């Protein structure tokens, strides 16, 4: 009875390993196909562009120049400066002066974009002074 239990345990382990090997082999074979079968397109070569460029060029599969050749999906990732300014205008941390074309928001050295006055500090020190923080003493 003891020998039968040992053989059935070994057979069960062998069966599990065989199932895992067949599963891994089937996944490896199916991943080598060039068909799109999942959330992400298969990448056959190394891409040195942005994530959007690599994803779109892999989805096309022809290796064509999508962004400069006038591809359908390339226009989605192109944004002119007006669209960029509108998107940035919705954020709270960029001033309208920073969004104007061909202008410098604040030309004073060390001054904040939000507080562009003479003598205004960009990041005024507001914490207490201690030996650990090594703050300057005035």
Swiss-Prot record:
The record marks 85-86 as: Required for proteolytic cleavage. GO terms for molecular function: hormone activity. GO terms for biological process: brassinosteroid mediated signaling pathway; calcium-mediated signaling; cell-cell signaling; negative regulation of growth; response to brassinosteroid. It is found in: Secreted. InterPro entries: RALF (IPR008801). One of its GO terms (cellular component) is apoplast. Residues 1-28 form the signal peptide. Keywords: Brassinosteroid signaling pathway, Disulfide bond, Hormone, Secreted, Signal. Disulfide bonds join 106-116, 129-135. It holds the Pfam family RALF. Induction: Repressed by brassinolide (BL) treatment. Residues 29-88 form a propeptide. Proteolytically cleaved, probably by SBT6.1 (S1P), a subtilisin-like serine protease (subtilase). Belongs to the plant rapid alkalinization factor (RALF) family. Cell signaling peptide that may regulate plant stress, growth, and development. Mediates a rapid alkalinization of extracellular space by mediating a transient increase in the cytoplasmic Ca(2+) concentration leading to a calcium-dependent signaling events through a cell surface receptor and a concomitant activation of some intracellular mitogen-activated protein kinases. Negatively regulates brassinolide (BL)-mediated signaling pathway (e.g. BL-induced hypocotyl elongation and branching limitation). This is Rapid alkalinization factor 23. It comes from Arabidopsis thaliana. The lineage of its organism: Eukaryota, Viridiplantae, Streptophyta, Embryophyta, Tracheophyta.
């Amino acid at each position: 009875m003891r020998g039968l239990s040992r053989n059935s345990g070994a057979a069960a382990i062998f069966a599990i390993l065989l199932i895992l090997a067949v599963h891994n082999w089937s996944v490896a074979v199916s991943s080598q196909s060039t068909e799109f079968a999942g959330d992400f397109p298969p990448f056959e070569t190394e891409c040195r562009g942005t994530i959007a460029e690599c994803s779109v060029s892999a989805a096309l599969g022809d290796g064509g120049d999508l962004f400069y050749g006038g591809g359908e999906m390339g226009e989605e990732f192109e944004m002119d400066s007006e669209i960029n300014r509108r998107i940035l205008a919705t954020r709270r941390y960029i001033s309208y002066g920073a969004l104007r074309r061909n202008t410098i928001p604040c030309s004073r050295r060390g001054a904040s974009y939000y507080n562009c006055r003479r003598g205004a500090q960009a990041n005024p020190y507001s914490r207490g002074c201690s030996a650990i923080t090594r703050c300057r003493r005035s």
